[in-house]
Amino acid sequence: MINKKISLGVLSILTAFSLQSVSYACTGFIIGKDLTKDGSLLYGRTEDLEPHHNKNFIVRLAKDNPAGEKWKDPSNGFEYPLPEHSYRYSAIPDVTPNKGVYDEAGFNEFGVSMSATVSTSANDAIQKIDPYVKNGLAESSMASVILPSVKTAREGVALIAKIVTEKGAAEGNIVTLADKDGIWYMEILSGHQYVAIKFPDDKYAVFPNTFYLGHVDFNDKENTIASEDVEKVAKKAKSYTEVDGKFHIAKSYNPPLNDANRSRSFSGIKSLDPDSKVTYKDSNYELLQSTDKTFSLEDAMKLQRNRFEGLDLKPLDQMALDGKGKPKSKKAVKGYAYPISNPNVMEAHIFQLKKDIPAELGGGVMWLSIGSPRNAPYLPYLGNISRTYEAYQEKSTQYNDKSWYWTVSHINDLVAAHPKPFGTKVIDEMKGLEKTWIAEQDKTTKEISDLVVSDPKAAQEKADKISLDRAEKTFKRLKAIEAKLVKEKPKNKKGLNRS
């Protein structure tokens, strides 16, 4: 998530924990289907920017577009022709579209899923040769332009490549797109350079805000899509670097690895594979990681909630509670570092794609936490839904008791500010809910999969009803938890409640 300055305010103690110089801080991951216990492909991302930044969850319905109509991004002036017909897709937008839509992630009606983006930036030498284009393609437009326009993940990558070639990129980004044939991982490196690969089924990856691609076989056209001048630009910038005699993309395009990317790369890999040989002091982390372990959906959720469990590090936002003062940036400070689960997480999503789920249903399930999942649940959504629960659609930029995001944000604030009395009670309950839903989801998906063959409309109505009912019940429970925390929170010396 790239830097967007929005003045939002909820007065809480957690404000003292938020980090200055926010810029960007998303963390993405992929777990190939050969490494999962049930053969599903898992991938997703935490969307990070700042505390108290409302996100919605909606479905944008299919529509016909007038000839010549364009997508226009008010945040940077980017424009691109709309297709004659826009496909239906789900989205997780911001509530301030005049500052960028940021649809972020979702399924479209053809079973293409997308997470966009993990923000990145090339080194200064590269940017002098191929600078970013101010009104080029940015994260704020990515999902909104691609998901309603493509029928396969490869088509999505090809469309991004076409746009970056013709109009340029406004920023560096990592994008992931998937369908029934697998997942593509794409790095938009500089103003007009990009490389995308078909991600291997037998590897996993954790990628915060830096480039990770090493050597790529540009001649493998089936599994690689790349701009023509990737090596040429690096050579012209005099940042061209080889490893074992082969061009290494990340080492050629990256700036030096910063502390926040180091801590999240290291802890993410260790969260999935504690036996991994990576160390906190490594100069870089390769994209494609190998292991003899297999993983579950719960492991992916655990990854996105990671706060250095089992490691000799503590989260930076813990410093204030420990009486060590407020961190002024994401730089590591004497045993404290920037975790994947941090106060800037605004939502987290995990796509669980399975071969036996029809493309009409998205080919899988998106598990979504609006608000940080630190003390909130992931709810399952199939790709054929046409509606979302009303609490997901509240657009307030300050606390609103009818909003899913603001309710979860308040719960997270309260638990983070008062860890001793509240402990892990909330997250333990959330994990219990998730365990129940995971156990139920295969049966639900099977029923709707059988129905979609004979009656797609009835299948959509059933998916809508199940997801709306679950969301309504869950939101009522979240409101009850919020009220209980407010009632039980410690009081200051004057007897006043503290948020």
From Swiss-Prot:
The organism's taxonomy opens as: Bacteria, Bacillati, Bacillota, Bacilli, Lactobacillales
Describe the family membership recorded for this protein in Swiss-Prot or TrEMBL.
Belongs to the peptidase C69 family.
Q: Which InterPro entries match?
A: C69_dipept_A-like, Peptidase_C69
Species: Streptococcus pyogenes serotype M3 (strain ATCC BAA-595 / MGAS315)
EC identifiers of the protein? 3.4.13.19
Q: Where is the active site?
A: C26
Does the keyword section mention RNA-binding? no
Molecular function per GO: cysteine-type exopeptidase activity; dipeptidase activity
Work out whether the entry's keyword set contains Hydrolase.
yes
Gene Ontology biological-process entries: proteolysis
Q: Which UniProt keywords apply?
A: Dipeptidase, Hydrolase, Protease
| Protein name, UniProt field | Probable dipeptidase B
Reaction catalysed? an L-aminoacyl-L-amino acid + H2O = 2 an L-alpha-amino acid
Query: Domain of life, per the record?
Result: Bacteria
**One Pfam family in the UniProt entry:** Peptidase_C69
